[in-house]
Amino acid sequence: MENPIKPVATRSIGIAVVLLVVGIVIGFAVGHYTVATAPSKPAINTFAAGSLKYALGNDFNPQYTNLTGVRVGMTFSGSISGAREVQEGKNYSVFISASAPILYQDLMNDTHYASWQIIFSANEMAITWTNPKYSILPSWPYWFENITENSTIVAASNASLDPSGFQAIETMKLAGLLYTGWDNSSILVGNEPVSYYVRLAFDDNFAMYMNYNKAYNDWFHGQFGYPVNDSLALYHQIFISKYLNGTTKLTTVEIGLDGYLTAGTADYALTYVSQAINQGLSYYENSTGGNGLPAWINLGSVNKTIDDFYEQINESGPAWDNVGNLPGAPIFYSITVISNYTNPYAIQYVYDLITGLGQHYLSMSKFDPLAQPFYVGDVPAQLKPLVVAPPSYLPVSSYD
């Protein structure tokens, strides 16, 4: 059966864009969801994850305003800090998070700032840089050596303020598990041992696995003295050892990471593929031009088995860089309308972001918009035809 929430394929630019815009204009005329025309349309005060700054701020919002006459007042920052602003009384009408669980836990669950959310796009973690000196070639599979050298400076977001921070932590933990877990019989979450997922990831090719395992142990055991097959060595080296010696730097929001790279104060940044595209950063790619970090660790999968593997680790970090201990989960972007500050045009904005025009601009920025968005909570009637219940195979931790 076809995956009901698979990402939409990236669209080409040109005639398709013209047709898309024309189609949307016609849609407004013949039944597209709208509200009654008013003499003065209030701006939609909107918070969005910083990683959406280009897709929304530069592309979607201007087009939306051209089509509707409704202005969009934007604030871009870390989703966790944005949720705290809502709790403190900031009057956002629309809230868009880079982590559906953060939106649910901070604004829906026992807090009642919102009564629903729609999950509409995925994303992937990547290793990025600007200085060619630090390029990681597609032919080089052992990327973890480059980013963990003592002299290498790595930048990431602070996990307590921004989802990309704890998603970077999850990615490093998953990589450690993937490269050490062939014989790991521990059943951490679910019904299968870690070894089940590792062997699937390597297509039961033990020789291929051993290439990675040997490189991992030669590096972390041989160079740094970690125990053999220590699955947390990669995570520990970046987020504890290098942080303590000043070669891992944390920032408050992912849109600031490029500043570290362009200023030369960091050699690599752990951030989203979409950020690499929007900010003109180089990123680690495989030989076919895709993300060099495989789906098993980049948190971009909407496949049941891979998502089950994500759950084998959690998001917890060291005391200075920690948000909690929820299980690992895909990177899902979600959107809601804040209950106390509902703008009459807020639902229309949500409608257009999760359908054709919004999907187009998200795809241009290397997000993975879902062909079938899904919802949690009491979604408004105007949006119900666009969404489905969460697929049963997705771990609840990916959206709750």
Curated annotation (Swiss-Prot):
Q: Does the keyword Signal apply?
A: yes
Using the record, list the residue span of the signal peptide; answer none if the entry has no such feature: 1-31
Q: Which SUPFAM superfamilies match?
A: Periplasmic binding protein-like II (SSF53850)
Q: Does the keyword Signal apply?
A: yes
- GO MF annotations for this entry? molybdate ion binding
Sorted UniProt keywords = Signal
Biological-process GO terms, alphabetical: molybdate ion transport
Q: Which family does it belong to?
A: Belongs to the bacterial solute-binding protein 1 family. WtpA subfamily.
Name the chain's protein: Uncharacterized solute-binding protein Ta1052
